[in-house]
Amino acid sequence: MTTRLGTADDLPAFNRLMTATGARDQFAIHQPQYYAAALELFAPDNAALLLAEYEGRPLAGVMVFTWGQSAAYLYGASSEMPAYAAQWAAMRWARARGCRSYDLWGVPDADEATLEAGFTERQDGLWPVYRFKRGFGGEVRRTVGAADRVYNGLLARLYAWRRGRQA
């Protein structure tokens, strides 16, 4: 297993991994051009695509973004275990840029006692993701969280209706 810093040429492989991961773990992913735009807008100094490969074949990839002394893992894809190698490479990349914190972005919405009591057993929601992230150590820090900014209310309601949700 090797890890390396990816380039824009690696985005098709990253997108294939994202598609497989989204299907396996049942979550929506962005269009390929979204990831390309994110990398283009923030790289080379404030974003990186890191890949874990075996015999030249990408098995996992992560996109990490930095600002100041902080780094955040926002997008990741894998064919199971190589995600650890890609994540560790991303942490080392961020540390080499002077980052003092690395945000793994998202855990189940539960207090720490519940997190500790349930992380080995629970399989629903974000629990498997938490188990993966917990393996790196660190501490849970709560922040406000992410939200979508709606620029066109009518389109947002139509989109929500189409997806079968309430706006």
Where would I find each of the regions flagged by the language model?
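A conserved beta-strand-loop-helix scaffold within acyl/acetyltransferase catalytic domains
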Residues: M1-M81, R92-A96, D148
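Generic preference for well-ordered secondary structure
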Residues: T19-G22, A36, A86, E116-A117, ...
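Hydrophobic alpha-helical segments
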Residues: R24, T114-A117, Y151, R162
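A short, terminal or domain-edge coil/loop segment
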Residues: E55-F65, M81-P82, S101-W105, L155-A167
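Acyl-donor binding region in acyl/amide transferases
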Residues: F65-G138
